[in-house]
Amino acid sequence: MVNLGTAVRSLLVHLIGLLVWQFDISISPVAAIVTDTFNSSDGGRLFQFPDGVQNWPALSIVVIIIMTIGGNILVIMAVSMEKKLHNATNYFLMSLAIADMLVGLLVMPLSLLAILYDYVWPLPRYLCPVWISLDVLFSTASIMHLCAISLDRYVAIRNPIEHSRFNSRTKAIMKIAIVWAISIGVSVPIPVIGLRDESKVFVNNTTCVLNDPNFVLIGSFVAFFIPLTIMVITYFLTIYVLRRQTLMLLRGHTEEELRNISLNFLKCCCKKGDEEENAPNPNPDQKPRRKKKEKRPRGTMQAINNEKKASKVLGIVFFVFLIMWCPFFITNILSVLCGKACNQKLMEKLLNVFVWIGYVCSGINPLVYTLFNKIYRRAFSKYLRCDYKPDKKPPVRQIPRVAATALSGRELNVNIYRHTNERVVRKANDTEPGIEMQVENLELPVNPSNVVSERISSV
């Protein structure tokens, strides 16, 4: 525990030192406190940043990179290996995890390298526009995935029958391909522009950063603000529809009036509702109000609650993304609009900090899934123990299934023997001919509700 506390304290000191060095605030009282923290016991300084020396405290960011890569690999494994996560929404989340993992593999290390060399690009110059293009590609892919998830869930809840005709694994892959195609279309012009004119991707001929005001404005709106607006609107519409469906159920509406509910639970509830409606009433004196309540499908409310829980998890993901990336894009727009009226050095330093806050968002999503979803949490725990075997199937029990070889008479009153291979012959009534019934074995799970739960969103 002492070692852990020391490590955390050392990491915080490293990060504070990086911010102090980045913003050059050594004169302020806060910086004085930090300076004392960085002083060693013998009066020497723990970290110094003279000209030409790398910013070694920035290496603490390696922890963020490792967490980003490892967490998103766990998400990809969970969606690939857990059958309960095989639905359209989780396919989108797996594709989002791929984009976030590539941020940790290809974008964040080079950004860390730039920090170590005081934002002087140390690699071949032709790699600068390629790196910027990858940064824009994966950032755009993240917001586009969240926008597509929001749209897909709203359509599924608002028009379930129409959505079911186009909801399959192949269709989900096609939608994901469209998301990536849009992201590639936004990022491809950057290397073309940068290779033709290096001034578009270099500031002061040393710092690798996108330096085309027109592209910054257009790209920010196309890749962030427009998808963000669509995402927020559709998310609140989804919450509105779910609340309306809940109120309809609480007021006693039948399932015929709930045609807008999600198809995930529409299939499993309609059959049950029909059986209850056609079944004879054992108590003729039962009040109509009570009969109407029994007619209501029992699983519908639970399914709506599951949809609400899934929407809450996605809402947290949306909110985290909004909080993490809005400062960068707003500052990016302001730096272009205000031009020389703004303090450009301050803007550059703010952008350098805000872009890393956005990068951290790529590593937070797996934590959100772990905290709010039992399936992801159980899967992550298994994989961290190097247990990659699928879960065992639930135990089964045998129940008799009646297969009629001949039917006659209006009503059937057949007593089924427990033994499986017996032939049971009973008469429907005294005036009707005999009816031969055959009893067969049928295996079902002990808990049939598991079959229903697999059709419900597992986000």
From Swiss-Prot:
Residue ranges, Cytoplasmic compartment?
Answer: 82-87, 153-168, 238-312, 372-459
Which UniProt key words apply to this protein? Behavior, Cell membrane, Disulfide bond, G-protein coupled receptor, Glycoprotein, Membrane, Receptor, Signal, Transducer, Transmembrane, Transmembrane helix
Keyword Cell membrane present in the record's keywords: the answer is yes
For this chain, the annotated S-S bridges are C128-C208, C338-C342
Tissue specificity of this protein: Detected in brain cortex, hypothalamus, brainstem and arcuate nucleus. Detected in the paraventricular nucleus of the hypothalamus.
Transmembrane stretches, start-end: 57-81, 88-112, 130-152, 169-190, 215-237, 313-337, 349-371
Cross-referenced SUPFAM superfamilies? Family A G protein-coupled receptor-like
Entry-listed glycosylation sites: N204, N205
- NPxxY motif, short sequence motif: residues: 365-369
- Annotated region (Disordered) at 274-302
Where is the protein situated, by its record's location annotation?
Cell membrane
The UniProt annotation places ergotamine binding at T140, L210
Q: Which ranges sit in the Extracellular compartment?
A: 33-56, 113-129, 191-214, 338-348
Q: Name one GO molecular function term.
A: G protein-coupled serotonin receptor activity
- Deletion consequences: No obvious phenotype at birth, but mutant mice are prone to sudden death from seizures. When fed ad libitum, adult mice display higher body weight and increased adiposity compared to wild-type littermates. No difference in body weight is found when they receive the same amount of food as their wild-type littermates, indicating that the increased body weight is due to altered feeding behavior. Overweight older mice develop insulin resistance and impaired glucose tolerance. Young mice exhibit insulin resistance, but normal glucose tolerance, due to increased insulin levels in the blood.
Please give the chief subcellular localization of this protein.
membrane
Task: Using the record, list the residue span of the signal peptide; answer none if the entry has no such feature.
Answer: 1-32
Q: Which GO terms describe its biological process?
A: behavioral fear response; cGMP-mediated signaling; feeding behavior; intracellular calcium ion homeostasis; locomotory behavior; phospholipase C-activating G protein-coupled receptor signaling pathway; phospholipase C-activating serotonin receptor signaling pathway; positive regulation of calcium-mediated signaling
Q: Where is the composition biased (Basic residues)?
A: 288-298
Which InterPro entries does this entry report, sorted A to Z?
A: 5HT2C_rcpt (IPR000377), 5HT_rcpt (IPR002231), GPCR_Rhodpsn (IPR000276), GPCR_Rhodpsn_7TM (IPR017452)
Assembly: Interacts with MPDZ. Interacts with ARRB2. Interacts with MPP3; this interaction stabilizes the receptor at the plasma membrane and prevents the desensitization of the HTR2C receptor-mediated calcium response.
The family note in this entry says: Belongs to the G-protein coupled receptor 1 family.
What is the protein's given name?
Answer: 5-hydroxytryptamine receptor 2C
Task: Record the organism.
Answer: Mus musculus (Mouse)
